[in-house]
A protein has these predicted regions:
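Short glycine/proline- and aromatic-enriched beta-strand/turn motifs that initiate or cap beta-hairpins
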Residues: 1-24, 28-31
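Outer-membrane beta-barrel translocator domains and adjoining extracellular loop/strand segments
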Residues: 11-16, 33, 43-48, 85-93, ...
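Transmembrane beta-barrel strands of outer-membrane/channel proteins
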Residues: 1-5, 32-36, 75-79, 90-92, ...
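Solvent-exposed loop/turn segments connecting transmembrane beta-strands
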Residues: 6-14, 54-56, 79-89, 186-190, ...
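Hydrophobic, lipid-facing positions within transmembrane beta-strands of outer-membrane proteins
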Residues: 14-18, 58-62, 88-92, 103, ...
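Residue-level signature of outer-membrane beta-barrel architecture
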Residues: 22-24, 66-68, 96, 139, ...
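Repeated loop/turn-to-beta-strand initiation elements of outer-membrane beta-barrel proteins
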Residues: 27-32, 70-75, 100-105, 143-149, ...
C-alpha cells in the first residue's frame, strides 16, 4: 500500500496505490495494481478566471510473469479512466539472461488504444492509437558496477491535439468580432529515445546512479536529459537525493 503526494506550482496531486502479487507454482506469478491520482490545480488560466480545477484519474492493471529457465515472459493489461480521457494498454515483454547471468537482453512491445474527449462536450470523442517497441541490454561490469542501455521507438496515430487548446482570431463576420480555431497537429508521430544508466554500489548499502537520455521525433523535437542520484538506506528508511538537467528544442 502506497500513498503519493506532490505539491508545487499551484498543482497538488495525491492518492493511494495498492499492489498485490501472488505466486502460483514455481514459475508463474500474477500481479494487480490499483492507482488513483487526485489533481487540484490553479494554472495561469485558472488563476485569471478565479476558477479552481480538479480531476481524478483511476488506473487498474493486471499482469502475469512466467519463468522458464533463464527466460522470463510477461504480459499485462492496463486501463486508465478520467473525465476526458480513457486509455487501454496491452503489453508483452521477454527477457533472457546470458553469459552466466551477467547479461540480460529484454525485448518489449505495447499497444495503446486511447479515447480523447472534452469534459465540457459529452459528444466530443476522438481516437488515438499508440505502438511502442523497446530493446534493453543490462550488463554487470564489475562486482559493484552495473550498466543498462535502452532504445525505444513509439509511433502515434490519430487525434494528437490538445482538445482544449484554441487560437483566437479576428472575425468580422460575427457580432463579437472574433472566433476560435482549434489547434491543428499532424495525425502521426514517431519518436526515438536512447538511454544509458550506470549504477555503482558503495559501502554501507549506498548507491550512486548516473543516467543520460536522448530523445528525438518527427515533429522536430530534440531533448537531452541527464541526472545523477545518491541513495542511502538508514534503518527502515531509504533516503535519495537527485539532480536532473533537461534541455529541449523544437
Amino acid at each position: 500500500i502506497l500513498y503519493h503526494l506532490y505539491e508545487g506550482g499551484g498543482v497538488r496531486i495525491d492518492g493511494p496505490s495498492i499492489l498485490m502479487r501472488k505466486q502460483v507454482g514455481p514459475s508463474t506469478s500474477f500481479v494487480t495494481n490499483y492507482y488513483v491520482d487526485m489533481i487540484s490545480s490553479a494554472s495561469i488560466d485558472v488563476i485569471t478566471t478565479a476558477s479552481p480545477y480538479s480531476e481524478e484519474r483511476t488506473q487498474w492493471s493486471v499482469g502475469m510473469d512466467y519463468l522458464r529457465g533463464n527466460t522470463t515472459m510477461s504480459v499485462a493489461y492496463t486501463t486508465s479512466t478520467e473525465s476526458d480521457f480513457d486509455a487501454k494498454t496491452y503489453s508483452f515483454a521477454v527477457s533472457q539472461d546470458m553469459f552466466g547471468d551477467l547479461t540480460t537482453l529484454t525485448l518489449s512491445y505495447a499497444l495503446g488504444d486511447d479515447t480523447v474527449g472534452r469534459s465540457d462536450d459529452p459528444l466530443f470523442e476522438r481516437d488515438a492509437d499508440r505502438q511502442q517497441y523497446g530493446v534493453g541490454l543490462t550488463q554487470i561490469l564489475t562486482r559493484n558496477l552495473i550498466a543498462t542501455l535502452n532504445y525505444q521507438v513509439v509511433t502515434d496515430e490519430g487525434f494528437l491535439n490538445n482538445p482544449y487548446r484554441t487560437v483566437r482570431y479576428a472575425d468580422p463576420t460575427v457580432p463579437r468580432g472574433f472566433s476560435f480555431e482549434p489547434e491543428l497537429y499532424p495525425n502521426t508521430r514517431t519518436s526515438n529515445a536512447l538511454g544509458v544508466r550506470m549504477k555503482y554500489f558503495l559501502p554501507y548499502r549506498a548507491a550512486l546512479e548516473a543516467e543520460y537520455r536522448y530523445f528525438t521525433d518527427t515533429w522536430d523535437i530534440e531533448a537531452h536529459t541527464a541526472s545523477i542520484s545518491y541513495t542511502q538506506p538508514w534503518g527502515d528508511f531509504v533516503f535519495t537525493g537527485k539532480y536532473r538537467y533537461h534541455d529541449q528544442t523544437g
